[in-house]
């Protein structure tokens, strides 16, 4: 309380809770399934490929970023990604949009790795394909009593090119229900 004739002490502003302008705070982007370290790695990639420093990535920059992070990046895919994520219609994506994209891709990549492990259990000869013989062996190990015609039908459903073998891509498509009929 101020004495008569004296000014009260000035009120101090509370410390800033938000990020200071120009400073990146990864904690603002952390969410379940995504660590601060992963956010920093994705931000590092974003900054590396934001070659013009606009804080947004255009199609050419996005293709380079995706390739460097180990993802296949065809032009059609790149333009589709930008179209799907570009909320302001600028034809480019900002960091928040890029983070959303990369988080989805990381999750997809992890899922694909898990499916690869299951595929490898079926591919007993490590030939890169699952054959009727492989399927017969797995069915027997699991105690399933299926005749060859049932097993062959399973192969035929998954086999995309009619060679009586299931490739990993065929298996992945079935497991993710992309081509299951």
From Swiss-Prot:
Any idea which UniProt keywords this protein has?
Calcium, Cytoplasm, Cytoskeleton, Metal-binding, Repeat
- Annotated region (Disordered), positions in chain: 1-29
Top-level taxonomic group: Eukaryota
GO cellular component terms given for this protein: cytoplasm; cytoskeleton
CDD domains named among the record's database cross-references: EFh
In which residues is Ca(2+) 1 bound? 50, 52, 54, 56, 61
EF-hand domain: residues covered = 37-72, 73-108, 110-145, 146-181
Report residues binding Ca(2+) 2: 86, 88, 90, 92, 97
Q: What InterPro entries has UniProt attached to this entry?
A: CALM/Myosin/TropC-like (IPR050230), EF-hand-dom_pair (IPR011992), EF_Hand_1_Ca_BS (IPR018247), EF_hand_dom (IPR002048)
Quote the PROSITE patterns the UniProt record gives: EF_HAND_1, EF_HAND_2
- Give the Low complexity compositional bias ranges: 14-23
Q: Where in the cell is it found?
A: Cytoplasm, Cytoskeleton
Any idea which GO molecular function terms this record carries?
Answer: calcium ion binding
| Role this protein plays | Plays a fundamental role in microtubule organizing center structure and function. Component of the infraciliary lattice (ICL) and the ciliary basal bodies.
| Summary of subunit composition and partner proteins | Monomer.
Q: Which family does it belong to?
A: Belongs to the centrin family.
| Name of the protein | Caltractin ICL1a
- In the UniProt record, the gene name given for this protein reads Icl1a
């Amino acid at each position: 309380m101020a004495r008569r004739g004296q000014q009260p002490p000035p009120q101090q502003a509370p410390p800033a809770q938000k990020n200071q302008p120009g400073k990146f705070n990864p904690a603002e982007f952390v969410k379940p399934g995504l660590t601060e370290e992963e956010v920093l790695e994705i931000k590092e990639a974003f900054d590396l490929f934001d070659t013009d420093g606009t804080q947004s990535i255009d199609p050419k920059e996005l293709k380079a970023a995706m390739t460097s992070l180990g993802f296949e990046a065809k032009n059609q895919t790149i333009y589709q990604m930008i179209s799907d994520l570009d909320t302001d219609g600028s034809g480019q994506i900002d960091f928040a949009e890029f983070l959303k994209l990369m988080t989805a891709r990381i999750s997809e990549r992890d899922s694909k790795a898990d499916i690869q492990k299951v595929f490898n259990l079926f591919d007993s000869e490590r030939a890169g394909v699952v054959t009727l013989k492989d399927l017969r062996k797995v069915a027997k190990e699991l105690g399933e009593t299926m005749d060859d015609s049932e097993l062959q039908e399973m192969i035929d459903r998954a086999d995309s090119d009619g060679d009586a073998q299931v490739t990993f891509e065929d298996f992945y498509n079935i497991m993710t229900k992309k081509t299951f009929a």
